Amino acid sequence: MLFKKYQFPINLFIIFEKINPVIYTSQVLTPNHYVCFIPSKWYYGLNLVLKKELFYNNSYLTDMSCIDTLKYDKFIPELNLLNNKRFLIYNIYYFYWIKVRLTLVQFSESKIESIDSVYKNASWLEREVGEMYGIKYTNKKDNRSLLLDYSRNEYPMLKDFPCEGYYEIYYDFFDNKLQYIKNEFIEL
């Protein structure tokens, strides 16, 4: 066996009992990894508990990302959290003392509460997800863009974003400025 099996902490089950999540785990592939689907209204409070609780205070947020479910046609009955929401946002946490990895998954439309006051590295991860998917964070301290132009409201990771983008951008050395040329889409 490659992994040493650690038990999921019982006090985390007690916290999860209130919010009624759907929890998945794999005993064969990665036995110390749990995936929990939670309602988005419990997102900030659950992050506070995971960071401030004495038993979990060595937890850290390792990754945050998003999935666009625009043309998602599969429906799993026990995952009734989708409810016509477009984005599936997931956070991956690691707990040092109990050697457990936890993934929190929530479904959201376009606004969720920021957790950058709880986890310091969440600011960068939220800026990245917000810029690529267009998700707005409430109570966020730093709303600067990372890669994209401030003047554009384009979100390149969405499924309805064209492959070639909306504009062709190049630097014109003769005029000494950026030039934007609108792409013309040709259907084959």
Question: Where is each model-derived feature located?
Answer:
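Terminal low-complexity/charged segments
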Residues: 1-188
